[in-house]
Amino acid sequence: MGAIVCINGCNANVLIPLHYKHMVIPPLTFSAKNLDTTKPGILDVRDVLDDPMAKENLATVIPIERASCRLLFVVSEDDRNWNSAYYAEQACNRLKEHGRTNYEVVSYPKAGHFLEVPYMPHHPSGIHPAVGKEVAFGGEPIVHADAQVDAWRRVQEFFRKHLQGLSGPLKSSL
C-alpha cells in the first residue's frame, strides 16, 4: 500500500493535456468572465476555472478511483487560487461512488492556498505564473501559520502510518 497527500489540489487536469500511458486527460477550460479584482487591483481567480463536474468537462476529471493507495486531502477553505474545498469534495464523492474508502480530509478555515512546511511566510497574494499578474491566494496570517504547523504534523503522521514497512518503489495503478 502507498500514500498520496494532495494539498489544495484540483480534481481535474488544468492548463495543458496530461499524458499517462495510453490516456490523455484534456485540460479544464476557464471563464475569464468569472475573474474578479480585489482592492488594490489584485486579481481573484478562485472561480475562473469551469466546473469539472459539468457534463461537458467530465473528461478533464482525474480518475482518482483507480488509485489503490491511501489519500489525504489537505484543504484551505480561504484558498483564492481555486476552490480547493469544492475540488476535494468532488474527489471524495467520486471515490465514494466507486465504493472507495481509502481517503481522509483535513480542512483549515481561513487558511490560504500555499500550505507549506511550518514557518514559511504567508503569501496573501503574488505573481501567478499562469496569469502573469498579481493574484490573491487568501488566508489570514496567524490562522494560516497555525494550519501549516498542524498540516505538517498530520502529513508526517499519515506517511508514517501508511508507508511504514514498505521497501522499494511502488508501481503506479493509474
Question: Which sequence ranges carry the predicted segments?
Answer:
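Short C-terminal domain-edge/linker segments immediately following a structured domain
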Residues: 34-41, 102-106, 135-141
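Short, solvent-exposed loop/turn and secondary-structure capping segments
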Residues: 15-19, 84-85, 117-118
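Serine-hydrolase catalytic core
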Residues: 41-114, 149-172
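Catalytic histidine-centered segment of alpha/beta-hydrolase-like enzymes
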Residues: 111-146
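Hydrolase active-site cap/lid region
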Residues: 1-49
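Long hydrophobic alpha-helices with heptad-repeat/coiled-coil character
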Residues: 1-17, 21, 135-174
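Glycine-rich, phosphate-binding/catalytic loops in enzymes
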Residues: 21-23, 89-92, 123-124
